[in-house]
UniProtKB/Swiss-Prot annotation:
An annotated Gene Ontology molecular function: polyprenyldihydroxybenzoate methyltransferase activity
GO process annotations (BP): methylation
Gene that encodes it: ubiG
Keywords: Methyltransferase, S-adenosyl-L-methionine, Transferase, Ubiquinone biosynthesis
Stated role: O-methyltransferase that catalyzes the 2 O-methylation steps in the ubiquinone biosynthetic pathway.
Protein name, as recorded: Ubiquinone biosynthesis O-methyltransferase
Alphabetical list of Pfam families matching this protein: Methyltransf_23
Similarity remark: Belongs to the methyltransferase superfamily. UbiG/COQ3 family.
Residue numbers binding S-adenosyl-L-methionine: R36, G55, D76, M120
Length: 232
């Protein structure tokens, strides 16, 4: 059984043509991308590395990692989003190998293949996030890096990430997030403990509305990032 929610897939497929419009529904991802990219590169040193972007969507992070010299493969189950990603890759001249395949299926086919695996803003959209974490651990080489980003589950994150972002500021379309699927850092840590990965760093991401920018912080109450390594 595919670890995907048909409703979630359809939601993002319907918006696929808007992925690369920096002023449309995916504007927060465009604003967030430089922060997460810099953080990933600081840990993994992407140049010359083989990287896998799970849940790549339209390819915002995939192209950015390729631009820093990584050999990138992006996977997603939305063929509409991958079509947009392929087209933008042709237009930008940045080479990324895209494929419509589930992380678990790729893990069976290509275990221990990648130096870097990213799974950003995806875990909160799937029925079994633990299954995705396990697949990431299988896909990465011994000594390699795995990076996650997701949303904490508490009153503050509900007020800011759902009510504030979707209904008040309208930074995101209504219904983008299902609060019940938000993941506490302790829960994500428990998923990681069931694999060969170990957590190296957990960082928060804070949005500054005055400057309209994201920045790394020690506040993990809403958005947070987790860097992991697989044992050598």
């Amino acid at each position: 059984m595919t670890n995907a929610d048909p409703h979630e897939l359809q939601k993002f497929s319907d918006l696929a043509h808007r992925w690369w419009d920096p002023n449309a529904e995916f504007k927060p991802l465009h604003e967030l991308n430089p922060v997460r990219l810099g953080w990933i590169d600081a840990h993994a040193h992407l140049a010359g590395k083989r990287a896998l972007d799970i849940g790549c969507g339209g390819g915002i992070l995939s192209e950015s990692m390729a631009g820093l010299g990584a050999q990138v493969k992006g996977i997603d189950l939305s063929t509409e989003a991958l079509g947009v990603a392929d087209l933008h890759s042709l237009e930008s001249g940045v080479t990324v190998d895209y494929e419509a395949i589930a992380a678990e299926a790729l893990a069976e086919r290509e275990p221990g293949t990648y130096d870097v695996v990213t799974c950003m803003e995806m875990l909160e959209h799937v029925p079994s996030p633990a299954g995705i974490v396990s697949a990431c651990a299988t896909l990465v080489k011994p000594g390699g890096w795995v990076f996650f980003s997701t949303l904490n589950r508490n009153l503050k994150s509900y007020l800011f990430a759902v009510i504030g972002a979707e209904y008040i500021a309208r930074m995101l379309p209504k219904g983008t997030h299902d609060y019940a699927r938000f993941i506490r850092p302790s829960e994500l840590a428990s998923f990681v403990r069931g694999t060969d990965l170990h957590i190296v760093e957990i960082k928060g991401i804070t949005y500054h509305p005055i400057g309209k920018r994201f920045a790394l912080s020690n506040d993990t109450d809403i958005n947070y990032l987790v860097a992991c390594r697989r044992g050598a």
